[in-house]
Amino acid sequence: MAIIQLGSTCVAQWSIRPQFAVRAYYPSRIESTRHQNSSSQVNCLGASKSSMFSHGSLPFLSMTGMSRNMHPPRRGSRFTVRADADYYSVLGVSKNATKAEIKSAYRKLARNYHPDVNKDPGAEEKFKEISNAYEVLSDDEKKSLYDRYGEAGLKGAAGFGNGDFSNPFDLFDSLFEGFGGGMGRGSRSRAVDGQDEYYTLILNFKEAVFGMEKEIEISRLESCGTCEGSGAKPGTKPTKCTTCGGQGQVVSAARTPLGVFQQVMTCSSCNGTGEISTPCGTCSGDGRVRKTKRISLKVPAGVDSGSRLRVRGEGNAGKRGGSPGDLFVVIEVIPDPILKRDDTNILYTCKISYIDAILGTTLKVPTVDGTVDLKVPAGTQPSTTLVMAKKGVPVLNKSNMRGDQLVRVQVEIPKRLSKEEKKLIEELADMSKNKTANSTSR
C-alpha cells in the first residue's frame, strides 16, 4: 500500500487494485510508515489495529463503483464520492437504543416503505436502505464493527465481504411472515394481476339519453376465504419447487445447425409460482373463487351502444397479492321505433298534407322531453328539415350541452281526388296560369 499526498488529501493505494479513502490530512496523527516490498503500512492513532482511520475521526469517505474485478481508473475518470450511511438516523433511533427499539423502528418503517404498499418511485430504494440498517444494527458483531469503524469496518466482517447485504425482501419475510397477503421478493415475482371482467348493460333509448343510476349484479373471481388467497390448504406450508429451484421458470436448450437455442418457459410443475403446495379444497389451489356481487352503477347522460364504463378494482381478484382487474360495463341501447339518433342529434320524420304545406300548420312532435308543438310555416317544401334547438342528446360528460332534434317534413300528394277536390284544383290551376300570363305580359 502506498500513501500519496495531494495537498490536504491522502490517497491510499493498494497494489494494482486501487481503493480510495479521502479525508483531511494530519501529519501529527501518523506515527510511522514502514516500507516493505513496494507496499506500505500506515498506523494511525485511535485504532485498535493498523488501519487507515478510526470511526471517531472525521467522516470517512469511500469511493463507490470500485469492485475487485474492475480495472484501475484511467486518467480523467470521474468518480462519485459518498459519505458513510448513518444507520441510526435511517431507523430514527439513538446509538444507545436497545434491540427491541431497533426492531420496532424497523418494523414500522418497513411496513410504510414496502414497495407493495408504497407506490412512490423512491419507496423501494428507501426500503432497501432501512433493511440494510436493520441488518447491521440487529447483529451484535456487525454493530460493534460499525460503531468502531463505520461501513469500512463491515467490509472485512465474516460473511459480509465487500459490504454486501442480504436481500431486503427475504429479511422482511423473516419478520413479517404472512403479512399483507405474502409480500416479499418471492411473492412479488409470482404476483399475478387479476383479469378484467365485462358486463353488458341494456338500456332503453331515454335511459341512454339522460343517464341513470342502476344496481347491477356481476360475477367475478374473489380471494378464497378458506386459504386467504394463497391457494394452499390451511395448516400446510408451500415448499420450493425442485424442478425450477423456486424460480418459476425453466430453460430448455436445443442444438440446431445454426447453434444452440435456449428458451425460457413457465415451469409446468409449479405453474410459475416457484412453490409446490397442498391445494386448498375450496378453490382447488387457484386462491380465488367465483362469487356474485351487487354494485351501484352511475350511467352518465349521452351514452350510446358500444360505450364502455370502467369501474376500477371491481374485476377479478389477482393471485398471490396481485392487483385486482377492472370492471368494464358495455352499453347496449334498445332503438326507439320513432326517434332515431345521429350522434347528439335526434332525427324525426313527419308527414303533412299538401294543403298544410301550402297554408302552414302546427304539429304535435314527440321528443325525449315529451310532446312539443312545432309550427310548420306556410309554403314548406317537401323534404324540408326543421330544427328544434336543444331537444337532442346531452353531450357525454357535458350534460349542460345538448344536440338538436331535426324534423324532416314529407309532403303527401294524394293519388285520388273527389270530383269536388279535382274541380277546385283545376280552378286553382287556371288561376295560376292566368297569374303567370299576366306577369309575363307586363
UniProtKB/Swiss-Prot annotation:
The record ties this protein, via PROSITE patterns, to: DNAJ_1 (PS00636), DNAJ_2 (PS50076), ZF_CR (PS51188)
What Pfam family does this protein match (any one)?
DnaJ
Asked if Iron is a keyword of the record, the answer is: no
GO biological process terms, semicolon-separated = protein folding; response to heat
Where in or outside the cell?
A: Plastid, Chloroplast
- The transit peptide extends across 1-82
In this chain the CXXCXGXG motif repeats are located at: 224-231, 241-248, 267-274, 280-287
Q: Name the residues that bind Zn(2+) 2.
A: 241, 244, 267, 270
Keyword Chloroplast on this protein?
yes
Give residues annotated as binding Zn(2+) 1.
224, 227, 280, 283
Fetch the Gene3D superfamilies from UniProt: DnaJ domain, Heat shock protein DnaJ, cysteine-rich domain, Urease metallochaperone UreE, N-terminal domain
Any GO MF annotation of the entry = ATP binding
Gene Ontology cellular component terms for the protein in this record: chloroplast; chloroplast envelope; chloroplast thylakoid membrane; vacuole
Occurrences of domain J (ranges): 86-150
Induction remarks: Induced by heat stress.
**Superkingdom, according to UniProt?**
Eukaryota
Output the SMART domains linked to this UniProt entry: DnaJ
Q: Which UniProt keywords apply?
A: Chaperone, Chloroplast, Metal-binding, Plastid, Repeat, Transit peptide, Zinc, Zinc-finger
Name the family the entry cites.
Answer: Belongs to the DnaJ family.
What the protein does comes down to: May function together with HSC70 chaperone to assist protein folding and prevent protein aggregation during heat stress in the chloroplast.
Q: What is this protein called?
A: Chaperone protein dnaJ A6, chloroplastic
Species the sequence originates in: Arabidopsis thaliana (Mouse-ear cress)
